[in-house]
């Protein structure tokens, strides 16, 4: 009877499940984003065609670029920068073409200098997108007006007009249809960060593997949302300083949790006698983190949670005081002493940061602050890094080569070829896959057949292209799929770049005019030849390769750690980079080519990264337990030995020579340091010092010992690496 009922109920539930899935789609973020992507594309092309624009493809290109920025604040910023960059770049392109087109040497030299400079400035922090659009618009105007300088003025006007149409289409769709506000998502992400901390703390307590990388990724995302949210709301902007401090609180809590991983107190004297009190503190902290991550925060409950942590901490301190009277406490092993002190220190730091975070939440400003006088120094662009300078020069050489080829040989699709040769050479190396230029020729081999199939399809479907219904279906479908990929990708991947140029090229076949075979051939040869030219210069001039990128990031990590040890504290930028570098290195490790890099070599690199990351987690530059003169001398000596080992590993990466580190002096210094710690503990016990003072000193000493263990392990692994491989170009 029951079986029969179940069998008859199952088919009838299928339509219900299908309907439930359909009705859930509008609540899915990727579906919403993809629908908006498609509608914005249709709207931009419709407006351009309705306006009888000469190049509706530029409006579509604008939609592709702007829609990737999913938040209102980000889109508004990029829209303004795109319009400003387009106007300036268009004027420069027009003036160069009108004045110097008849003198190719001067013309190409001036254009090359301008594009190289704007490309390089894309790599600094002040309105980089405007610089990119300056260069891109100058390239478009010059490549289209090269054969007819008198038309360059019209190309400039058309370009500006089409960009404005695309910007308006994106702003309209993003503002009216499921708008996403960075300010709102920041607050949601902030609560999510506390939930991540709660999960990490819980996993650390239970001894299960924990994903601390997720917290660093979320913090990086929150910093971006903070910037965009400030452009959306004056109310949010008034609270930015407090939100920055809250992100600092989250980062420091994460830093306090990390050293707790792998602590073994299961059978220690302190765990047996103070385990219940330790568990009480841990449970109170975990509950407070969960409250901070709740959708609706109750100020009263948070204050009660803070009081519960404080009560539990006092109970733990009293238990430790009572245990001092136990004669067995004087015979406890050093590892157990360091372990319990490290745990108590970390718990105390978490408690302090939680209290600070609660005060920040209670003290959020309600009134909007008055604006201060504008600091003009903040508007001056910075100096771009060396990579962006070389990348700008390289992509400009690719551009000039394509323009010379266009002028002398006049291949089909010349203007598309020029744009692709510059765009692919400049942007494909920084795609989020982390491969750089390693597979530039793979891209050529894959892209040409794909573009060929696209053009064959356009030839077969050319009668349908005059139908606006078919055109709209094609645009919406293509951009919907593109939106699905863009929603899940941090940045614009190689495949996304090529597919974008493919659709832009296809839409260049204006449906208001008969589509000829030659027009379709121009799309194929323009993209194909441009991809080949870009690949030639990608692989021959300063190629960006994952092994070199990995090597450089290891060197950067070692340098920041060494500078922090010498100066006593890293800069805010240095702290941020130390949190970002492990993820960037792992991305490059995944792209190392086998069998050039053996499995053992890659595993050693992973182990080295893990040891260096754990060394960072101990925050030695913030932990100086030496209070007496002899203690300060010992910690200074240990930090100098740390810096020496870090420097030797860095030199090995820089020179390609084997890493040779003698860890004997560090081991001897740690033994001497341990003896000093034991003496200092006994002295403080005899003086009945406050447990907070004792755990603070010995807990920081434990971090020194952990850091020494991690660094010596890193040196052993580094000695097994073939660092000469990381400077070579091993795979074309």
Report each predicted region and the residues it spans:
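A transmembrane helix-and-boundary motif of multi-pass membrane transporters/channels
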Residues: 1-239, 344, 355, 359-600, ...
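Cytosolic, long alpha-helical scaffolding segments
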Residues: 193-371, 408, 412, 556-732
